[in-house]
Curated annotation (Swiss-Prot):
Catalytic residues identified in the record: 294 (nucleophile)
Main function: Plays a role in the regulation of alternative splicing, by interacting with AGO2 and CHD7. Seems to be required for stabilizing protein-protein interactions at the chromatin-spliceosome interface. May have hydrolase activity.
Organism encoding this protein: Mus musculus
Family the entry assigns: Belongs to the ARB2A family.
The name this protein goes by in its record: Cotranscriptional regulator ARB2A
Disruption phenotype: Homozygotes deficient mice die before postnatal day 25. Mice display retinal coloboma, cleft palate, and hypoplastic semicircular canals, retarded growth, genital anomalies and malformation of the heart and cranial nerves. Mice display a complex phenotype mimicking both the major and minor features of CHARGE syndrome (CHARGES).
Basic and acidic residues: compositionally biased ranges: 224-237
Motif (Prevents secretion from ER): 414-417
Subunit details: Interacts with AGO2. Found in a complex, composed of AGO2, CHD7 and ARB2A.
């Protein structure tokens, strides 16, 4: 007879019951009850359910997936979308598989930025030595020389990297909704230079040197040889069982890694300031525009706090998408809040139609609906409105007028009419 792994949860209860049935709780009875229960466990059956190794392909082809003509990730044989639960009851393994695919997606998007969008990969820090950790951003050929317009793209926090809005959208929906590529292509078509930030690439990881544990020496007691042998035998059996259950509980321990942070780019906020100082501030463009999603909005506000005068002199308009900034917590001053009210607009997740005014408790930029209640989709759904907003802001500046700003004001006027 064998019992399932789930039954092990009740092991302490069974032991207590065995003790009660035998009419005592001395050490001999406890040991006998435990041995009896353990002898019924089918270890071979448990081993069959062991977690497979975290050995995943490093290419889309290896995963047997590819992007079709619509930019959707599909299985090359079945045509089906990506399946997360590839193996039942192995959530951790499935998650690791998903993360491995995500790393491939990141490299794939990098390749598209260079091959499809004709962007250049620029290493930072600009004065980095050969041996120190480095990151990079992407820029169009005319990013620093375009005299008219420059668009700067900042994604949110998490696993996303340059060129992405949301990994989940890329894998489960399509490249258009999940990447910044539509923004980049339209911007270039409309005469913008483009800079794509990479605010989550803050460090590199290296494996910690394994420390060799010193073997413990004998305690040197004078106990009889027979008793010591019996104790050692019990100890070995106990260790063997403990090691087995530890292997089942955590079959593949993660490698211990240490993080080496990238100089002056150790956080999204640092990265935004660094790219401003070394690239955006040097750009020739008369009008600089930002598109910042989620935590990218917080990074922009932090940039403005640290470089207020410079930002005001160069930036014409800022489109935020479901930004998580907070002018109170970030201690943005009154002049910053006033500038944001005049030059920023935040497209937030909402079930209201696109561009409908959404009330805010914070005294900063106007908030309008992105036309979706899904956070990760706000950039893609507000895509046409953002370009219209920038065009209006640019036109207003060129005619020496304040931008009528905001889709919020347009909506209110429309409703009043």
């Amino acid at each position: 007879m064998s019992i399932s792994l789930s039954s092990l949860i009740f092991l302490p209860i069974w032991i207590n019951m065995a003790q009660m049935q035998q009419g005592g709780s001395n050490e001999t009875e406890q040991t006998a009850a435990l041995k009896d229960l353990l002898s019924r466990i089918d270890l071979d059956e448990l081993m069959k359910k062991d977690e497979p190794p975290f050995d995943f392909p490093d290419t889309l082809e290896g995963f047997e997936y590819a992007f079709n003509e619509k930019g959707q990730l599909r299985h090359i044989k079945t045509g089906e979308p990506f399946v997360f639960n590839y193996r039942e009851d192995l959530h951790r393994w499935n998650q690791k598989r998903y993360e491995a695919l995500g790393e491939i997606i990141t490299r794939y998007v990098y390749e598209l930025l260079e091959s499809d969008c004709n962007l250049k990969k620029i290493s930072i820090p600009v004065d980095a030595t050969e041996s120190e950790p480095k990151s990079f951003i992407f820029m169009s050929e005319d990013a620093l020389t375009n005299p008219q317009k420059l668009m700067v793209l900042i994604h949110g926090s998490g696993v996303v990297r340059a060129g992405q809005w949301a990994r989940r959208l890329i894998i489960n929906e399509d490249l258009d909704s999940g990447t910044q590529i539509p923004f980049i292509k339209r911007a270039m078509d409309e005469g913008y230079g483009v800079i794509v930030l990479n605010p989550n690439e803050n460090y590199i990881e290296v494996e910690k040197q394994k420390m060799h544990k010193q073997s413990s020496s004998s305690d040197g007691t004078d106990e009889p040889a027979g008793k010591r042998e019996r104790r050692d035998k019990v100890s070995k059996e106990t260790k063997k069982r403990r090691d087995f259950y530890e292997k089942y509980r955590n079959p593949q321990k993660e490698k211990e890694m240490m993080q080496l942070f990238i100089r002056e780019n150790g956080s999204p906020e640092e990265h935004a300031v660094y790219v401003w100082d070394h690239f955006i501030a040097q750009a020739a463009a008369e009008n600089v525009f930002f598109v910042a999603h989620s935590y990218g909005g917080l990074a922009f506000v932090e940039l403005m706090i640290q470089r207020e005068a410079d930002v005001k002199s160069k930036v014409t308009a800022v489109a935020l998408t479901d930004s998580v900034h907070n002018v109170w917590h970030q201690e943005a001053g009154k002049t910053i809040r006033e500038w944001m009210r005049e030059n920023c607009c935040n497209w937030v997740s909402s079930s209201e139609p696109l561009d409908t005014s959404v009330e805010s408790m914070l005294p900063d930029c106007p908030r309008v609906s992105a036309g979706t209640d899904r956070h990760e989709l706000t950039s893609w759904k507000s895509f046409p409105s953002i370009f219209k907003f920038f065009a209006e802001a640019s036109e207003a500046k060129s005619s020496s007028q304040k931008p009528a700003l905001t889709r919020r004001s347009h909506r209110i006027k429309h409703e009043e009419l």
